[in-house]
A protein has these predicted regions:
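Sec-dependent signal peptide recognition
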Residues: 2-8
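Extracytoplasmic metal-acquisition and chelation regions
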Residues: 17-319
Length: 319
C-alpha cells in the first residue's frame, strides 16, 4: 500500500512539473519572437517613396522608416528633434538631397557617414531644373503654360535653376538610386550581400515589367493632358509627351484672373482629368472643374509609398 501511494505521489509530481514547463513554453517562445523583432536594424529614408525603394532592396528583415508623415507636404516639412533622434538610432539615412528638409537633416546628424545620397552618381542630363516664371505678359505670368519641358516645381526652397526634387517619378533614375542603395547596404551588412543582390535584380525585373505595361497603356491614350494643383510629375510626363496645366502659382492660390485663364487653357486642350492632392487646398480646383466640360476630379498623392502603383493609377486616370 505504501509502495502504491509513493508511486501515485511521484506520478502527480511528475505531471505537475510537466504542466508548469508546458505553461512556460509559450512565454519563452513569446520572448524569443519579441527579441527577434527588437533586433531588426532600422534604416531611415527621407520620404515615403524612398522608403518604399529602400525596403525593396533591403527586404523585410529591416525596419525602414520615412521621416515625412503620411499626407504631409514634403516641401514645407520641418524636421523635429524626435525625427533627428530616430535617424541617430538608424544605421543609414537614405536621401535624394534635393528637398530643403533633407539638407537640414544631413547638416544636423552627428554621424555624417550614415548619410546616403541615392542620386550621387546620377547622370546630370536626367535631372530636370525647376523654374519660377516672372514674365511681364499676364498670360504667361500666371504660370500655366504649354511647354512640356518647363513645369514649376514650386519648391519653397528652390531658386531659379535648382533641381526639380520629385525625382522618384523618374523611371530612368530608379536604377541609379536602387544601385546606390544596394551598394551601401552591402557595405554596411556584407554578410547579407546575396540577399541584397537578389532583391536588387528582382526590382530591376519588376521595373522593366512596369515600364512595358505603362508604355502599352500610354500608346492607347487619346488625350495626353491633365490638370493638377501642385505640379510634381515632370520627370514622368516628359518621357511620354503629356501636357500639364498647373493650378498654383509660386506656391500660392491662383487669383480670379488666373483661374479664368486656367479654365480657358483646360478647354483648349480638352482636359477632363483634374488631380487634387491631400497636401494642398481644393477650393480652386472645385471652382475650375465646374466650368470645364466633363471634368472629373480624382485624388492623387505624390507622396504615396508604392511609386509603381501610383504611376499606374495616374496613367489610368488619363483619357
Amino acid at each position: 500500500m505504501k509502495k502504491l501511494l509513493t508511486v501515485l505521489l511521484l506520478g502527480v509530481l511528475f505531471l505537475s512539473c510537466g504542466k508548469n514547463e508546458g505553461e512556460k513554453t509559450p512565454k519563452e517562445n513569446g520572448k524569443t519572437e519579441k527579441t527577434v523583432t527588437e533586433i531588426k536594424e532600422t534604416l531611415g529614408a527621407s520620404t515615403a517613396p524612398l522608403k518604399w525603394l529602400v525596403q525593396k532592396i533591403a527586404g523585410d528583415n529591416y525596419n525602414v522608416i520615412a521621416i515625412v508623415p503620411p499626407n504631409a507636404n514634403h516641401e514645407l516639412f520641418e524636421p523635429k528633434p524626435d525625427d533627428l533622434k530616430k535617424l541617430e538610432n538608424s544605421k543609414l539615412f537614405f536621401t535624394y538631397n534635393l528637398l530643403g528638409f533633407e539638407k537640414k537633416i544631413s547638416e544636423s546628424l552627428n554621424n555624417s557617414d550614415k548619410i546616403v545620397n541615392v542620386l550621387s552618381d546620377a547622370d546630370p542630363a536626367l535631372l530636370l531644373k525647376g523654374h519660377h516664371h516672372h514674365h511681364e505678359d499676364e498670360k504667361e505670368e500666371h504660370g500655366h503654360h504649354k511647354d512640356k519641358d518647363k513645369h514649376d516645381d514650386h519648391d519653397k526652397h528652390d531658386e531659379d535653376g535648382e533641381i526639380d526634387p520629385h525625382v522618384w517619378f523618374s523611371l530612368k533614375l530608379m536604377p541609379t538610386a536602387a544601385l546606390e542603395i544596394k551598394n551601401k547596404l552591402v557595405q554596411a551588412y556584407p554578410d547579407k550581400k546575396d540577399v541584397f543582390e537578389k532583391n536588387y535584380n528582382a526590382f530591376l525585373d519588376e521595373l522593366a515589367k512596369v515600364k512595358e505595361d505603362i508604355n502599352k497603356k500610354m500608346a492607347s491614350k487619346t488625350k495626353k493632358a491633365y490638370m493638377i494643383y501642385h505640379p510634381a510629375l515632370n520627370y514622368f510626363i516628359k518621357d511620354y509627351n503629356v501636357e500639364e496645366v498647373a493650378v498654383e502659382y509660386e506656391g500660392k492660390e491662383p487669383t480670379a484672373q488666373q483661374i479664368k485663364e486656367i479654365i480657358d487653357e483646360a478647354k483648349e486642350h480638352k482636359i477632363t482629368t483634374i488631380l487634387v492632392q491631400p497636401q494642398f487646398p481644393k477650393q480652386s480646383i472645385e471652382i475650375i472643374a465646374k466650368e470645364v466640360p466633363n471634368a472629373k476630379i480624382v485624388e492623387f498623392n505624390v507622396d504615396k509609398e508604392d511609386v509603381f502603383e501610383n504611376l499606374k493609377q495616374f496613367v489610368d486616370y488619363l483619357d
